[in-house]
């Protein structure tokens, strides 16, 4: 008995070819190359999602550090002071305050200074 799977095979190929529409050259026309390009693109997308988290954290830390140094405190001293005083604010929110609301950020810096005795 022969295997009849034309519908599913066509559906699978169509899905790949639709996904690689817009790729350059043979990558958008030839199935074998298109499949390889699709797999590689998905791999890069996965890695990119992981890198994005790291990049944003780095950006937040840089922003906090710059704002803290303007107030006479280093980044690590600020974070340590906030931890001692029991303030649980994440780096994203702290960076947001540093950029958009410097007065509130200054209050956090003062709390951290008091906690570490500076």
From Swiss-Prot:
Q: Which biological process terms from the Gene Ontology are attached to this UniProt entry?
A: ribosomal large subunit assembly; translation
| Keywords attached to this entry | Ribonucleoprotein, Ribosomal protein, RNA-binding, rRNA-binding
Transmembrane ranges, per UniProt, are: none
Q: Which GO terms describe its cellular component?
A: ribonucleoprotein complex; ribosome
Cystines in this chain? none
Report a single Gene Ontology molecular function: rRNA binding
Tagged with keyword Acyltransferase:
no
* A Pfam short name: Ribosomal_L20
What does this protein's UniProt record list under function?
A: Binds directly to 23S ribosomal RNA and is necessary for the in vitro assembly process of the 50S ribosomal subunit. It is not involved in the protein synthesizing functions of that subunit.
HAMAP family per record = Ribosomal_bL20 (MF_00382)
Tell me which family the UniProt entry assigns to this protein.
Belongs to the bacterial ribosomal protein bL20 family.
Query: Could you tell me what this protein is called?
Result: Large ribosomal subunit protein bL20
Q: What species does this protein belong to?
A: Thermosipho melanesiensis (strain DSM 12029 / CIP 104789 / BI429)
Gene name on record?
rplT
């Amino acid at each position: 008995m022969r295997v009849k799977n034309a519908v599913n095979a066509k559906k699978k190929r169509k899905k790949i070819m639709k996904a690689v529409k817009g790729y350059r050259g043979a990558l958008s026309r030839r199935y074998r190359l298109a499949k390889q390009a699709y797999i590689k693109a998905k791999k890069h997308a996965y890695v990119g999602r992981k890198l994005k988290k790291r990049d944003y954290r780095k950006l937040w830390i840089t922003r906090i550090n710059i704002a803290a140094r303007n107030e006479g405190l280093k980044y690590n001293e600020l974070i340590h002071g906030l931890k001692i005083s029991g303030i649980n604010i994440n780096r994203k929110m702290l960076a947001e305050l540093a950029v958009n609301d410097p007065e509130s950020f200054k209050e956090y810096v003062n709390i951290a200074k008091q906690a570490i005795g500076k």
